[in-house]
């Protein structure tokens, strides 16, 4: 990456464009992003608060991607950056505990980050397979949330709004807020599974 500051700013703008309608929306005030490469067994992690976010990216993961191809390295690095930057900008669900104490909270946070990555085009969509549960987090949840854009192009933004607005967040309450009182997480998940099985 020849200009790391511009590279991160570009991806941060793209994340904001997917999560929000406009710059006038209520959003976390991300001031600084510290991006560090570190030799460890893992992929990447975000820490800190929105104003002062730190992202660590594994040089072991970089090497693994580079050994496949330069295309894979670029594709994976951008995808990981999209995911981690979402964590800086995204709201956290209210009334259900925390990331480390509640699986619904965790599935929402990690699922939304991977939904934005998928929407940005940095997942191989052919890897989507039937099965799992909306509570599985990461790709399983993320692909589902991204699939909701086939029902409403603004589904990711609306999902994110439910995280901000609902006093006691749940996937079912989010689906009802987004698609009406007759919608349910189970019904939409089953529809998504049928889509994947075609």
Predicted regions and their residues:
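Short pre-active-site segment immediately N-terminal to the catalytic Zn-binding motif
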Residues: 61-81, 96-105
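Active-site recognition of the HExxH zinc-binding catalytic motif
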Residues: 79-92, 110-114
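Membrane-helix exit/interface motif
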Residues: 89, 93-94, 121-124
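Post-HExxH zinc-binding segment in Zn-dependent metallohydrolases
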Residues: 11, 100-142
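Auxiliary, metal-adjacent structural segments of Zn-dependent hydrolase domains
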Residues: 1-60
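Pan-zinc metallopeptidase signature
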Residues: 141, 148-198
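Short helix/loop segments within enzyme catalytic domains
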Residues: 119-136, 147-165
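Lumenal/extracellular "mature" regions of secretory-pathway glycan-modifying transferases
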Residues: 47-64, 101-105, 124-128
């Amino acid at each position: 990456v020849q200009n790391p500051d511009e590279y991160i700013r570009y991806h941060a703008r793209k994340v904001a464009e997917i999560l929000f309608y406009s710059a006038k929306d209520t959003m976390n005030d991300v001031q600084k992003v510290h991006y560090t490469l570190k030799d460890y067994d893992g992929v990447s992690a975000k820490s800190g608060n929105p104003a002062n976010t730190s992202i660590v990216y594994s040089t072991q993961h970089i090497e693994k991607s580079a050994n496949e191809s330069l295309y894979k390295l670029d594709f994976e690095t951008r995808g990981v950056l999209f995911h981690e930057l979402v964590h800086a900008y995204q709201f956290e669900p209210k009334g259900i505990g925390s990331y480390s104490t509640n699986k619904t909270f965790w599935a929402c946070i990690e699922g939304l980050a991977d939904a934005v990555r998928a929407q940005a085009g940095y997942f191989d969509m052919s890897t989507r397979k039937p099965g799992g549960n909306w509570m599985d987090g990461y790709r399983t949840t993320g692909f589902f949330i991204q699939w909701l854009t086939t029902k409403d192009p603004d589904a990711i933004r609306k999902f994110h709004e439910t995280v901000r607005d609902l006093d006691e967040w749940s996937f079912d309450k989010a689906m009802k807020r987004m698609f009406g009182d007759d919608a349910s997480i189970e019904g939409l998940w089953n529809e998504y599974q049928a889509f994947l099985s075609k």
